[in-house]
Amino acid sequence: MAKASETERSGPGTQPADAQTATSATVRPLSTQAVFRPDFGDEDNFPHPTLGPDTEPQDRMATTSRVRPPVRRLGGGLVEIPRAPDIDPLEALMTNPVVPESKRFCWNCGRPVGRSDSETKGASEGWCPYCGSPYSFLPQLNPGDIVAGQYEVKGCIAHGGLGWIYLALDRNVNGRPVVLKGLVHSGDAEAQAMAMAERQFLAEVVHPSIVQIFNFVEHTDRHGDPVGYIVMEYVGGQSLKRSKGQKLPVAEAIAYLLEILPALSYLHSIGLVYNDLKPENIMLTEEQLKLIDLGAVSRINSFGYLYGTPGFQAPEIVRTGPTVATDIYTVGRTLAALTLDLPTRNGRYVDGLPEDDPVLKTYDSYGRLLRRAIDPDPRQRFTTAEEMSAQLTGVLREVVAQDTGVPRPGLSTIFSPSRSTFGVDLLVAHTDVYLDGQVHAEKLTANEIVTALSVPLVDPTDVAASVLQATVLSQPVQTLDSLRAARHGALDADGVDFSESVELPLMEVRALLDLGDVAKATRKLDDLAERVGWRWRLVWYRAVAELLTGDYDSATKHFTEVLDTFPGELAPKLALAATAELAGNTDEHKFYQTVWSTNDGVISAAFGLARARSAEGDRVGAVRTLDEVPPTSRHFTTARLTSAVTLLSGRSTSEVTEEQIRDAARRVEALPPTEPRVLQIRALVLGGALDWLKDNKASTNHILGFPFTSHGLRLGVEASLRSLARVAPTQRHRYTLVDMANKVRPTSTF
C-alpha cells in the first residue's frame, strides 16, 4: 500500500499452488497462486489479488503532525528499529496504472496473454487464445467512481495476481482511507457469487497485527457483471520486501517476525491459516507491523483453491491442505528471504537454504531454526506459532549478544536453569597440593557435568504434572520415594490415573541418573520409549545416560537432536560443549562461547571457554574470558585465582613474560587475604617468578610485597610456605611445607 521500488514490482506475487512441477517452457509470474482440488469440499478458498506496493505520488491529503521518538524497540526490547515515516495515502496512487506485458498471464490457465509481436501491440484486454477465458489488465474502477454508494475511488495503488487494488475514501466515516480489492478474478461470475458468501468470516478476524476487514461490497463493471470487493483498512508505511541484494540484519528480521507470529497464532486459534506470508505482505507502519492481504486466508484442512507464493509455500499443501505446519513453513521462508541470498530458478526462490551463506555460518542457531521451520517433513517443524516464537526469542538473544558483545540472558520455558556448576575449580584445584599435600585431578568428569546440567521442565499438560512439580528440587532418593507414593495413590487426592503419565517415569529416570544407576535408568527409558516413542525429553535423558557411560559420540548425536529441535535453548549447547570437552573435541569452544556470550550467569561456560582457549594456546583469550565473570558472582574470586594460574602454569619460563607474572600478582593482591586459596596462589606466583628469574632479567619493583630479585622472591616464597604450614590439616604435611620453606629461604650471612 505504500510506495514501492521497481524491484518490488518485479518480485514474487500470489499464485495458485502448483499441483505438480510445470514442464512447459512458459513460466507463470511469481504471484500468489492456487491449485484447485475438486475432489474435496471447496470452502473458503477463492482467488484474491496481492498487494503489489508500486506507487507514485499524485496529490496530498492533509495530515496531522505528531512527535514520535525516532526509534522504537522490538523483539522484547532487544532490537532498536527506526520508525517508519507516516505516509499520506494519496502518495501511494499510481499516475499511470499499466501492467507490463511481461506480467500478463491468463487468470484461468496461466499462459501468457496480451503480448506484442512483430506486427501487433499486445492488447490490455481480450480473450485467452489458449482457453478462451476473458482477461483484462485495465482498471475496473476509475477515480471518482462510487462503490456501494459509500466508497469514493481515488485510483490504483498496486496490481495483484488477480486484479487491481484501489485506494478509496469512505464517505460515511469522515473520508477514512480504505483499500478495495477484488475477491476473485472478475471473469468468473460463479466464483464471484461464492466468494461473497464464503469470505464473510474474514470480517470476524480482529487482531492488532492483522489488517482490519470493514466490508464486502459489489460493484457492476463496465460489462454489466457484478464484481465483489473486500473493503479493508488502509495500512500506510512500507513492506518488508527489499530490493534485490538488500538484506536485513538477522536481529532486525527476527524482531519483525516476532511481532507477526502472535497474529498467526491468533488465526490458528480460531481455525484459520494465513497461507501467504512473505515480506511484501508484512507492513511496517509508524506504530507497528501488520499482516495485510487476507485473501489467501482459509480454514485449516480445507481444500479447493489453495493460495500461496511459490518459493514460500509449503510443498505438501496440495496433499494436506492448509495447516499450522504450512504456515510455519512460510515463516521460515520469509526469514530466509529477508536475511539470506536465496538462489532463484525460473523467477522463484529455490527450496532449501544456501548452506554456504555467510549468515548461516555466523549464526549457527539461526540456521538450525530455519532448517526446522522449513523441514520437508511437516511433522518435524515447530508444532505451534508459540513454540516457534519462544525459540526465535532465544535465537534473537544469542544474535544480539553476539552482535553487541553484551549478554542477553533469558529464562527458558522448557529447561530449568543449571542446577549447579562444573569445572569451576579444575585449574586452581591442583594448587590445593600446597594446602593438603594431595594430588587433585584436573579433568572434568561426566558425573560432575550431569549433576550440574539443566533438566527438562515438567510438561504442564501431563496428568501427573501437579504432583511432580513438588519433587523437582528434591534429592534423588526423596524423589524416588515420592514417585513410589504417587504410583500407589498416596499423593493422589483427586483420583487421577497416573498410568498414562510420561513425566512420572521420566522423573524416575532423572533420579536414577543422578544416583548413577545408569543401567536401570536406561531400561526404564527404553520401556517408556516403546510406549510413547522417542520424544525430545526422552532423547535428552538418553544422551545423559550415554554421557555417563562414556559413549560420547552417541551423546553428542542425541544432544544435537535436541538442539536441532530447540535451537534457541542454551541447555543443549552447554551439554554439547561439555561432552566435546570430555571427548577431546575442539568443538567445545564454539558452544561454550555461545552460552557464555548470551548468559553470563552460566559460570560453567566461562570456565569451560577459558580451558578451551588455554588448550589452544590462547592464554590472553582465556584470561579475558575469566575477567568477564561479574563481581556479583560467587565464583568471581575463583575466576581471579584461575586467571592468575592460567597466566603461569603449564608453561616453560621462556614462554612467560615479566608483565604476565606481574599481572598474575596483581590479580592475587586484589583479593581479600581471607580467601582460602590466596596463600597457595601467592606461593605459586612467587615461585614461578623465582624460576623465571633464573634465565631472565627484570626490574626490581616489588611484587606481592617483595623485591623482584632472587633474594626478595626467596623471602616471599618462604613466607608463603610457612603461612601454609600453619594451616596444614596434618602434621606430616606441615613438616613437608616447613622443609620446603627452609630449602628456598635465602642463605643467611653474618
UniProtKB/Swiss-Prot annotation:
Molecular function per GO: ATP binding; identical protein binding; protein serine kinase activity; protein serine/threonine kinase activity
Modified residues (Phosphothreonine): 63
TPR repeats, residue ranges: 536-569
Main subcellular location: cytoplasm
Impact upon substituting residue 131 to A: Decrease in activity
Impact reported for residue 92 to S: Decreases inhibition by AX20017
Disruption phenotype: Disruption causes delayed mortality in mice. Mutant accumulates glutamate and glutamine.
Official protein name in the record: Serine/threonine-protein kinase PknG
GO cellular component: cytosol; plasma membrane
Effect of residue 131 to S: Lack of activity
Biased composition (Polar residues): 17-34
Mutagenesis / variant outcome for changing residue 109 to A: Decrease in activity
Stored InterPro entries: Kinase-like_dom_sf, PknG_rubred, PknG_TPR, Prot_kinase_dom, Ser/Thr_kinase_AS, TPR-like_helical_dom_sf
Family statement drawn from the similarity comment of this UniProt entry: Belongs to the protein kinase superfamily. Ser/Thr protein kinase family.
Catalyzed reactions per annotation: L-seryl-[protein] + ATP = O-phospho-L-seryl-[protein] + ADP + H(+); L-threonyl-[protein] + ATP = O-phospho-L-threonyl-[protein] + ADP + H(+)
Domain observations: Contains an N-terminal rubredoxin domain, a central kinase domain and a C-terminal TPR domain.
Modification comment: Autophosphorylated. In vitro, incorporates up to four phosphate groups on Thr-23, Thr-32 and Thr-63 and/or Thr-64 and/or Ser-65. In vivo, is probably phosphorylated only on Thr-63.
Region annotation (Disordered) ranges: 1-66
Quaternary assembly: Homodimer. Interacts with the FHA domain of GarA.
Function: Phosphorylates GarA. May play a role in metabolic regulation via control of the phosphorylation status of GarA. Plays a crucial role in the survival of mycobacteria within host macrophages, by blocking the intracellular degradation of mycobacteria in lysosomes. Required for intrinsic antibiotic resistance.
Outcome recorded upon mutating residue 106 to A: Decrease in activity
PROSITE patterns assigned to the protein according to its UniProt record, in alphabetical order: PROTEIN_KINASE_DOM, PROTEIN_KINASE_ST
Keyword Nucleotide-binding: yes
GO process annotations (BP): glutamate catabolic process; glutamine catabolic process; intracellular signal transduction; regulation of cellular respiration; response to antibiotic; symbiont-mediated evasion of host immune response; symbiont-mediated perturbation of host defenses; symbiont-mediated perturbation of host signal transduction pathway
Binding positions (ATP): 157-165, 181
